[in-house]
Regions:
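Bacterial N-terminal signal peptides that target proteins for export
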Residues: 1-10
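C-terminal motif of bacterial Sec signal peptides marking the signal peptidase cleavage site
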Residues: 15-19
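Bacterial signal peptide processing site
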Residues: 21-24
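Terminal, regulation- and interaction-focused segments at domain boundaries
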Residues: 26-36
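Short, solvent-exposed recognition patches
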Residues: 35-97
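Extracytosolic low-complexity repeat regions of secreted or lipid-anchored proteins
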Residues: 72-130
Length: 130
């Protein structure tokens, strides 16, 4: 193999490696970040691999939430307008016996797979029950 062909092969291999590195997904924010709307949170949950084909919005929203909704009986999503309202919801969730709640900067999700959500959305998992 001549030097030109060898150099071209090395360049192609280097470009391939660079493309792989550039396509890696950035980790989610440690604090879970914020979502501008319940629809944006819903899309993030879907992108994490949890099926929620039909988000049913609560009218009016849950007590402390700016917006809230559910997907069936095992998934509940909510966004909050302030830290105070978010904290009030977490305090209530502790007494209501929720097993685990995913918590971000302005959102919560109750689901059957809190660790998957934490891995994809960031934030923390608050364990409140058995």
């Amino acid at each position: 193999m001549n030097r030109w062909a060898l150099g071209a092969a090395a360049a192609v291999a280097a470009c391939s490696l660079a493309a792989c590195a550039a396509s890696e997904v950035a980790p989610p924010p440690a604090d879970g970040g914020t979502y501008e709307s319940i629809e944006a949170l819903w899309q993030a949950v879907e992108n994490a691999g949890l099926r929620c084909p039909d988000l049913v919005l609560d009218k009016p929203p849950a007590k402390f939430a700016a917006s809230s909704g559910s997907c069936g009986e095992f998934m509940f999503l909510a966004t909050y307008s302030s830290d105070t309202y978010l904290q009030s919801q977490l305090d209530f969730g502790r007494t209501a016996g929720q097993k685990a709640i995913n918590v971000g900067k302005n959102w919560t999700v109750v689901s059957e797979d809190p660790e998957r959500l934490r891995k994809h959305l960031g934030g923390t998992v608050l364990h409140t029950g058995p």
